[in-house]
Each structure stands twice: as C-alpha cells, then as structure tokens.
C-alpha cells in the first residue's frame, strides 16, 4: 500500500499460463510488482485457480476470466483506490485472460499486454477498444512473430502504444527492467 491517503492508481497483474509453470511469482510479474509499488500504485497480483494454494483447477480461460473479474471487484473496494484509474496488466496467457475482461469492465481505464499469445486467444476485441493500451513483444519471441505483432498493432485504434524489444524472447530473462520501464511510463501517463 502506498503511503498517504490517496486516491492512488491501481494495477491488477495477471500471470502467464498456469499449465506451463506460470504463477504470480513469475520473473516478469515480480519485476512489475516491485517497480510499480515504488510508483505509488495499489497493486494486486494473484494466482489463477489451481495455481499455488489457489482452489480449483485450470478451466481454459473461462474460470480464469472469472478470477480476473473477482480481482477487479476486490481491488475496486480497497480503500484509497482511484476508481477511474485502474489497469489490467497481463503477461502472455495473463493478457489473454485479463484483457477481454478489462475491455468490458468500465472500472478499467487502461490495458497492458506483454507477449500477447495471438495463437492461444482471440485479441480481435482490441480493434474496437478505445481505452489506452500498451502492447510489448520480444523480437526473439518464438510464439509471436514480430511481423504479425506489428501488423496487429498497426490496425488498433488510438490511444495505443506498442514496442518490440529486439533481443528479448517470450520469457524476458534479463529484460525485465526494460518491460517495467515501458509499463510504468505508460501507466503514469494514462492513469
């Protein structure tokens, strides 16, 4: 919790795919959490159902979207949260689960997708999204060709921002600081 009385912007961070080792303790999630907490954000990171000590089991995005809805409701009730300054930050499958919910929920003002898995989920809803959005991909990401990422981003309506970090792959080892810098600057500018 930031010091002071607020209200403070808030971000809900959604982790990568549960079936491939994704959890709220992922390197990207932890780096974002550490950096944004120093920027006076109220933050929530959580494990999707069936991960860590969470109840339930993976349900191919359906239950995970319910988890995101619950996280938004929980965060919106935390004292000190600026209700018009909330964002969803999703990494990989976390973007696939979190961004559609954030798009539909009027409490969410901004969306961030890190390594959005276009082959796993349909991100076409973003073509109708007028909320500020940031998309980041690694130039060496084996799951998302840079050409496809750029083609998709070019078709999105404003406001938008997108970046390819040339030497980074899908897992961002050693590039966490670059991600956190881009995400922090974006959220500070739109929230």
How would you label these PLM feature ranges?
Residues 140-144, 170-171:
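Acidic catalytic loop of the alpha/beta-hydrolase fold
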Residues 145-153:
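Short alpha-helix in the alpha/beta-hydrolase fold that links the catalytic acid
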Residues 66-131:
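Primarily recognizes the serine-hydrolase "nucleophile elbow" in alpha/beta-hydrolase
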Residues 129, 134-137, 141:
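Short beta-strand/loop motif that positions the catalytic acidic residue
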Residues 155-171:
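Catalytic histidine neighborhood in serine/cysteine hydrolases
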Residues 8-11, 132, 160:
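Alpha/beta-hydrolase fold active-site loops
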Residues 168-180:
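Catalytic histidine-centered segment of alpha/beta-hydrolase-like enzymes
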Residues 1-79:
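Serine-hydrolase catalytic machinery in alpha/beta-hydrolase-like enzymes
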């Amino acid at each position: 919790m930031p010091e002071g009385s607020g209200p403070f912007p808030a971000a809900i961070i959604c982790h990568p795919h549960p079936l491939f080792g994704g959890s709220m303790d992922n390197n990207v999630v932890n780096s974002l959490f550490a950096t944004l907490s120093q920027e006076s954000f109220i933050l929530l990171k959580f494990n999707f159902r069936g991960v860590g000590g969470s109840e339930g089991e993976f349900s191919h995005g359906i239950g995970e979207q319910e988890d995101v809805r619950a996280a938004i409701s929980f965060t919106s009730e935390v004292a000190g949260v600026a209700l018009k300054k909330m964002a969803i930050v999703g990494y990989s499958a976390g973007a696939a689960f979190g961004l559609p919910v954030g798009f539909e929920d009027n409490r969410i003002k901004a969306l961030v997708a890190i390594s959005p898995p276009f082959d796993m989920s349909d991100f076409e809803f973003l073509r109708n999204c007028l909320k500020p959005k940031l998309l980041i991909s690694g130039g060496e990401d084996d799951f998302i060709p840079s050409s496809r990422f750029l083609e998709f981003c070019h078709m999105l309506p404003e406001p938008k921002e997108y970046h390819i970090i040339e030497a980074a792959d899908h897992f961002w080892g050693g590039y966490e600081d670059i991600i956190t810098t881009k995400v922090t600057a974006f959220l500070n500018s739109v929230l």
